[in-house]
Design a protein with these regions (language model features):
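Functionally critical loop-and-helix segments that line ligand-binding/catalytic clefts
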Residues: 2, 50, 55-60, 68, ...
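Catalytic domains of cell-wall/extracellular-matrix polysaccharide-remodeling enzymes
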Residues: 143-209
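Structural preference for beta-strand elements that scaffold enzyme active sites
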Residues: 58-60, 81-82, 111-113, 141-145, ...
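Substrate-binding cleft of extracellular glycoside hydrolase catalytic domains
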Residues: 46-48, 53-68, 87-164, 171-172
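Hydrophobic membrane-insertion alpha-helices, especially the h-region
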Residues: 21-43
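N-terminal Lys/Arg-rich, disordered targeting/topogenic segments
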Residues: 1-19
């Protein structure tokens, strides 16, 4: 009987020891998993400053009405010096969030420029007045940009209307105006608009002609890393840091 009891006791002790070992191992594994989970979600987001293309010292981004909420401080921390915001279209559409975005961009110490989208079906007077009425003096520091697509300059009249819009805004604000467009459209406008500089839409930074004040080199560039990474059209200023600082 004693022998049977000893066998039973030893078996029980073995099972108990095995169970305790299993539980201990399980607790250790759970502890490791829990520690990793806490570290993963609590660790700071690391932002990596994006490089500026060789030969340039200033770069920025552009946003429009379809852009989601933008963390301007994150942009500033990633070698972004300026931002262009789409404000008006023709004489019928205004980005209602522009002035709020302008305020936040200034708080992040970014220089700001506005984008007006040209509509050839509307007179230059109507478009300029719509811009003046809605944007007012909140035009930022950078030249006013007029976005032009190929379908809006198909006639001589549409080109002349654009030229008139440029001059009207320059006269009203005593402020530079540039045309935001592609090399092909720039060529088509060369005989009509001769003294206005351009913001060229490209996929590289090769055309550093003095007529190109800005060059958009990537329309979907990744800025930052991790949870704060964002893709935006990215542009370089075709000049020196000192020349850029003139815009105040």
């Amino acid at each position: 009987m004693n022998t049977m009891e000893n066998v039973f006791t030893n078996a029980t002790q073995y099972k108990t020891k095995k169970l305790l070992t299993f539980i201990s191992s399980l607790l250790i594994i759970l502890g490791v998993v829990l520690s990793f989970t806490v570290w993963f979600f609590a660790k700071p987001v690391i932002s990596k400053s994006i490089d500026i293309p060789d030969g340039f010292s200033v770069q920025g981004v552009s946003l429009n009405q379809t852009s989601s909420y933008i963390d301007f401080d994150n942009l500033a921390n990633n070698n972004i010096n300026f931002i262009y915001m789409r404000t008006t279209y023709g004489d019928s559409s205004m980005d209602s969030g522009y002035k709020s975005s302008l305020s936040r961009a200034k708080s992040a110490h970014l220089k700001v420029g506005t984008i007006h989208v040209y509509d050839a079906s509307v007179t230059a007077a109507a478009q300029s007045q719509y811009y003046i009425d809605n944007v007012g003096n909140s035009i930022g520091e950078l030249p006013i940009a007029i976005s032009v697509t190929s379908d809006q300059i198909s006639t001589a009249t549409s080109k002349q209307r654009l030229a008139s819009l440029v001059q009207t805004l320059i006269s009203h604000y005593d402020h530079d105006v540039i045309i935001y467009t592609t090399p092909a459209i720039q060529k088509k406008l060369s005989s009509t608009i001769k003294n206005t500089k351009y913001w060229l839409i490209e996929d590289n930074t090769k055309d550093t002609s003095s007529k190109n004040l800005f060059i958009q080199y990537d329309e979907d560039h990744t800025i930052g890393t991790g949870l704060k990474a964002i893709k935006m059209p990215t542009t370089v200023f075709n000049g020196t840091q000192k020349q850029f600082e003139v815009y105040k």
